[in-house]
Amino acid sequence: MIRLMGIDPGLRFMGWGIIDVDGNHLKHVASGVIGTDGSESVPLRLCELHGALKKLIREYAPAEAAVEETYVNRNGSSTLKLGYARGVALLTPAYEGLPVAEYGAMTVKKSVVGTGSASKEQVTMMVKRLLPGAEIRKADASDALAVAICHAHHRASAAHVVAGKRMA
């Protein structure tokens, strides 16, 4: 059995999900959303995300992490802020010594639903089917669990994994 963490980056809401994988069997362990206060400075919000992710990693002890790649939208400022949050999502597990994989949204959707053009509702529905009993309250948590499920399906491919190195 291996424990995996999926992360859906976001500066306002960062989704996270922990699953256990035993062969083809997937089990929901925990999931949720880390929220930050939009009135706070960006550096403070990034520190909050880092601290919360570090606490979750130490509490649930996943062996590997996976992060969804971000997309570029028309608003350059929003894209840049999302990139900052993604940096925290990549750095924190790597700093804690976890291998970190990255997957595009279409790959995640195709792995979970069977089509890269699936809606958020379809992804949530399939996550609930694949993880019976999981109570998912926010789309960001569902997306993070979908990233973890995608990683469970693709983790044998070393091309997606960047080795983490424990620094402290």
Curated annotation (Swiss-Prot):
UniProt keyword list: Cytoplasm, DNA damage, DNA recombination, DNA repair, DNA-binding, Endonuclease, Hydrolase, Magnesium, Metal-binding, Nuclease
Compartment(s) where it occurs, according to its Swiss-Prot or TrEMBL record: Cytoplasm
Main EC class the enzyme belongs to: hydrolase
Superkingdom assignment: Bacteria
Keyword Ion transport: no
Functional description taken from the UniProt entry: The RuvA-RuvB-RuvC complex processes Holliday junction (HJ) DNA during genetic recombination and DNA repair. Endonuclease that resolves HJ intermediates. Cleaves cruciform DNA by making single-stranded nicks across the HJ at symmetrical positions within the homologous arms, yielding a 5'-phosphate and a 3'-hydroxyl group; requires a central core of homology in the junction. The consensus cleavage sequence is 5'-(A/T)TT(C/G)-3'. Cleavage occurs on the 3'-side of the TT dinucleotide at the point of strand exchange.
Protein name: Crossover junction endodeoxyribonuclease RuvC
Source organism of the structure: Gluconobacter oxydans (strain 621H)
